[in-house]
């Protein structure tokens, strides 16, 4: 591939970071990845083609990692996420997120020119910032300069309210890195919907009844304004909930198509896919509208 960027993708998942390189039309070749989840591995290979897998990051021998120009290491977020257990990333703590520290030996041995990391913004929160800085100091001792910033996907053409911290680290002398400017975009859920989603994503009539009952209790006028609005928004448009207020959770929320999705998380069977309303909503006629989950492709 000539001067293609050689990439190693640790904590690869389904390969979203190498996918970004494809979208940006950056000539590259993934020379190895590291992933242990069998379904993620299957998805990765289907999307990107068969790729050498280094396996468990905690068992990788640094000298056996192929030389690379870019190493990505977006480690598990569960121990730093506000919805997780907050056990942190302290070296030697044994938490999922502390797997980060197994990257240290690999980076020291291979010294890629570029490093890329993405994680939840709470990594910069008061409970975790100290250990994050310790990691930054390690990279600086190897000769890297670190640039990090919290970015929101909705500012870059993705209809999802998703704030994440990104860190780019560059080895040796270089022109100072600048993160992309915010884009003036108005992409909303409506823009990414499939034309003919499978019937299995549509909710049962009982859910529609509960939705209407709760809307009437909360006041229909505001909901109707949101449903009928055609103005695009860079915010989530929360129309109502299928569940009573005391059970109010993301699982029951119905969102407007003219806004952005809430932050997507791993569903783990929790019925937490964002749900939208379709059709000409008439609260007196159940057949005037449908409620459905976003499909995996839409997510």
What are these model-predicted stretches?
Residues 289-299:
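FAD-binding beta-loop-beta segment adjacent to the flavin cofactor pocket
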Residues 8-10, 72-73, 116:
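Structural recognition of the beta-strand scaffold that forms the well-ordered cores
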Residues 2, 60-70, 80-269, 278-283, ...:
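Class I S-adenosyl-L-methionine
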């Amino acid at each position: 591939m000539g001067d293609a960027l050689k990439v190693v993708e640790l904590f690869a998942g389904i390969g979203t970071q190498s996918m970004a390189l494809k979208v940006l039309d950056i000539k590259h070749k993934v020379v190895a990845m590291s992933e242990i989840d069998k379904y993620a591995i299957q998805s990765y290979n289907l999307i990107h083609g068969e790729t050498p897998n280094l396996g468990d990051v905690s068992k990788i021998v640094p000298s056996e990692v192929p030389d690379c120009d870019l190493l990505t290491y977006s480690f598990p977020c569960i121990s730093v996420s506000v919805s997780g257990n907050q056990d942190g990333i302290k070296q030697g703590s044994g938490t999922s997120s502390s797997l980060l520290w197994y990257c240290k030996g690999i980076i020291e041995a291979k010294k890629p020119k570029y490093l890329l990391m993405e994680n939840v913004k709470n990594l910069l929160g008061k409970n975790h910032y100290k250990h994050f800085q310790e990691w930054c100091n390690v990279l600086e001792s190897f000769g890297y300069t670190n640039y990090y910033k919290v970015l929101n996907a909705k500012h870059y053409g993705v209809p999802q309210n998703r704030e994440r911290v990104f860190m780019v680290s560059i080895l040796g002398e270089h022109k100072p890195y600048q993160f992309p400017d915010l884009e003036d975009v108005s992409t909303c859920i409506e823009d990414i919907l499939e034309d003919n989603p499978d019937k299995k994503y549509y909710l049962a009539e009982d859910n529609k009844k509960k939705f209407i009952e709760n809307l009437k209790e909360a006041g229909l006028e505001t909901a109707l304004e949101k449903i009928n609005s055609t103005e695009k928004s860079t915010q989530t448009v929360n129309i109502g909930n299928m569940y009573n207020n005391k059970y109010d959770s993301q699982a029951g929320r119905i969102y407007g198509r003219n806004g952005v999705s809430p932050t997507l998380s791993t569903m783990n069977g929790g019925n937490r896919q964002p749900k939208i309303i379709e059709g000409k909503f008439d609260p007196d006629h159940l057949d005037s509208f449908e409620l459905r989950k976003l499909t995996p492709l839409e997510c």
